[in-house]
Amino acid sequence: MIPEKVRKVLEANGLEALEFEPGSTPTAQLAAARIGVETSRIAKSLLFKAKDGSYFMVVCPGDKRLSSAALKRAAGSKLSMTDADETERVTGYRPGGVCPFAVEGVAILLDEALGDYATVYPAAGTDATGVATSLGELARITGGRIVNFSEADRS
């Protein structure tokens, strides 16, 4: 079930969430397979913490890994990824369902590579949801800043 705070944001912006079986989309790869799109069209959301205690949510294509140097430039300081418990405490979402909607006190950084596609799919608050949107809509809805900080996954 989609969290009420996310549902309100989506409805206010004319977006509709996709809902699947519980636990069916916990990774970008599984979400892509379930939705029927390339992994690069899944907008994964990762939470980071700066030394000063501020938080940054990075939203990037599901097939990308982050360039730490570019991330540091975008955030203005070195960041450390938060663990599952801290992520849930700060965002209200568990890993697999983390999304940039209805998150307070967190700077949102959106990878410009998401703009390679007309439609991308971030989670909608649980690991069984997604929402079809665009980079432009994500920036408008979340107030996020568009930056370039990812690189192709070489694994």
Range-by-range predicted roles:
Residues 1-155:
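Extended, low-hydrophobicity, polar/charged segments
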